[in-house]
Swiss-Prot record:
Catalytic activity: a carboxylic ester + H2O = an alcohol + a carboxylate + H(+)
GO terms, molecular function: carboxylesterase activity
Organism of derivation: Drosophila mojavensis
EC number(s) given by UniProt: 3.1.1.1
Region feature (Disordered): 1-38
Protein name: Esterase-5
Superkingdom of the organism of origin: Eukaryota
Length: 38
């Protein structure tokens, strides 16, 4: 199915793997910032 097909986007800092989940995109392996504390 289309939801199982991997999607790879090449960015200046590297590649990001994700999936097209029929209506929204899900990205994997993107580093996230730490939550604000205080």
């Amino acid at each position: 199915s289309a939801a199982a097909d991997p999607l790879i986007v090449e960015l200046p800092n590297g590649k990001v793997r994700g999936r097209d989940n029929e209506g929204y995109y899900e990205a994997e392996g993107i580093p996230r910032a730490e939550p604000p504390v205080g």
